[in-house]
Amino acid sequence: MADEILRLEHIQKELELSRDVRQTIIPNLSLRITAGEFVSITGPSGSGKSTLLYIMGGLDKPSSGRVFLDGEDITETEEKEMTRIRNRKIGFIYQFHFLLPEFNAVENVSMPMLIGGRLSRKETRERAMALLDMVELQDKYTNKPSQLSGGQQQRVAIARALANEPKVLLGDEPTGNLDSRSADKVYQLFERLNRELGQTVIVVTHDEEFANRAGRRIHLVDGKIESDRVLRDGVPVLSQ
């Protein structure tokens, strides 16, 4: 049996709107993700999808409950240490690519490795180029973001997210700003990363086609899991 990579226990998230008013985003949610899973998270706007993703990745903290990443309780981890954990274990991809405009593709992909400091500059550059090759941008090494299409920019962002060989790849609406052709290239890339490399992928999306190409689909309503299903070719095969 594959190892558990992520566990959430009785997560609650509240926002303080004023001194006397609090809004509950996630009332009480528990969830386990196994290493190597491809999970899509869907739900209407305001259902808590992105909040849940940020809690999973240590970008936000729950009001109560526990979060375990790769067997480690990260719930109360100090921000400095959490930054180190994110750099080593989590790759983030957002709706907007957030590439540094003054740097070319190789330099953008290199950035997390330079921050991590585990590779030499030569090794860092070689790995950055290999990752760009993997996302089919081998002819764009020296291009800056302004010289790339939206789909190409997002593929550079995916390569950057993979730079430090993360345990978990998290995507928040990664195809939200892309046309259908570019979105399909991103779909295929996520599928290949998961199937060929065993990469754990968790993606928040409004895109039904993307959601159904995952191996597991979790649907949220009002911060609660309404359904959690294993999929095969987009069809539920087992209720969990």
From Swiss-Prot:
Disulfide bonds: none
Bilayer topology term: Peripheral membrane protein
Main location: membrane
A Pfam family of this chain: ABC_tran
Gene Ontology cellular component terms for the protein in this record: plasma membrane
Top-rank lineage group of the source organism: Bacteria
PROSITE patterns documented for this protein: ABC_TRANSPORTER_1 (PS00211), ABC_TRANSPORTER_2 (PS50893), LOLD (PS51244)
Catalytic class of the enzyme: translocase
Enzyme Commission numbers on file: 7.6.2.-
GO molecular function: ATP binding; ATP hydrolysis activity; transmembrane transporter activity
Record's keyword terms, sorted: ATP-binding, Cell inner membrane, Cell membrane, Membrane, Nucleotide-binding, Translocase, Transport
Binding positions (ATP): G43, P44, S45, G46, S47, G48, K49, S50
Location in the cell: Cell inner membrane
Membrane among keywords: yes
Domain ABC transporter: 6-239
Family of the protein in this entry: Belongs to the ABC transporter superfamily. Lipoprotein translocase (TC 3.A.1.125) family.
Subunit structure: The complex is composed of two ATP-binding proteins (LolD) and two transmembrane proteins (LolC and LolE).
Function per UniProt: Part of the ABC transporter complex LolCDE involved in the translocation of mature outer membrane-directed lipoproteins, from the inner membrane to the periplasmic chaperone, LolA. Responsible for the formation of the LolA-lipoprotein complex in an ATP-dependent manner.
Protein name: Lipoprotein-releasing system ATP-binding protein LolD 2
Organism of derivation: Chlorobium luteolum (strain DSM 273 / BCRC 81028 / 2530) (Pelodictyon luteolum)
Gene of this entry: lolD2
